[in-house]
């Protein structure tokens, strides 16, 4: 097997089948790999990461590996470090929220954030929504905070700000008002929820791309 088709260690090389080796050593920049549970997705992803670096196709800080849980992210880092004799601290390996948080802390000015912005957990976010609703004299028996919270998070995850949401009925209009009030208070306090991390990171990247073209 040639250098271009080799992996970082014989142990990992022997643990991959032909299809997995093909996925790890693809020359294409983009590829969609479909695989079921327990099929070795993490092994392939981390081996691909290591292969790109070992063959000097990419630098450690230019490769992004994203997963859904902190446990999976830690496992990826351990597997990569087992194949590469380098410091993993500068690598972009983590969860969606974790990586967005790290990116925004690095580019807080471009993202219109204070340098030391804070992240609200689910309980804090719900409390913040309740405060906004109380200030607006919204009866929670008629419009539960849980429903409003779902509305806000869903729109943020779809990339929609309060000003962009089109409301056609009284309930939707009230939810939009609460969403807007929540945005204003969070911005003033220098805090944001988990969905805000994703949305603000997306907006910053789009804005940066538009400026560079």
Language-model-detected regions and their locations in the chain:
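A basic/glycine-biased coupling hinge at the interface between accessory DNA-binding modules
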Residues: 2-11, 28-31, 36, 50-213
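Pre-Walker A adenine-sensing motif
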Residues: 14-25
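Conserved lysine of the Walker
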Residues: 41-42
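Post-Walker A alpha-helix
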Residues: 45-46
């Amino acid at each position: 097997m040639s250098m271009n088709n080799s992996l970082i260690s014989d142990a990992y090389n022997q643990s991959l089948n032909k299809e997995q080796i093909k996925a790890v050593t693809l020359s294409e920049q983009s590829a969609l790999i479909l695989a079921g549970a327990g099929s070795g997705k993490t092994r392939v992803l981390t081996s691909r990461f290591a292969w790109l670096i070992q063959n000097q196709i990419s630098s450690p800080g230019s490769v992004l590996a994203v997963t859904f849980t902190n446990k999976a992210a830690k496992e990826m880092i351990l597997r990569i470090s087992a194949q590469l004799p380098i410091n993993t601290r500068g690598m972009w390996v983590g969860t969606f929220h974790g990586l967005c948080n790290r990116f925004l802390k690095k580019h807080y000015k471009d993202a219109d954030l204070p340098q030391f912005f804070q992240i609200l957990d689910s309980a804090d976010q719900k409390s913040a929504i309740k405060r906004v609703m109380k200030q607006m004299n919204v009866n929670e028996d008629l419009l539960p905070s849980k429903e409003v919270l779902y509305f806000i998070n869903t729109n943020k995850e779809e990339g929609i700000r309060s000003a962009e949401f089109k409301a056609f009925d009284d309930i939707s209009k009230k939810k939009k008002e609460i969403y807007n009030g929540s945005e204003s208070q969070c911005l003033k306090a220098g805090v944001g929820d988990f969905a805000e991390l994703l949305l603000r990171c997306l907006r910053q990247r789009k804005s940066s791309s538009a400026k560079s073209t």
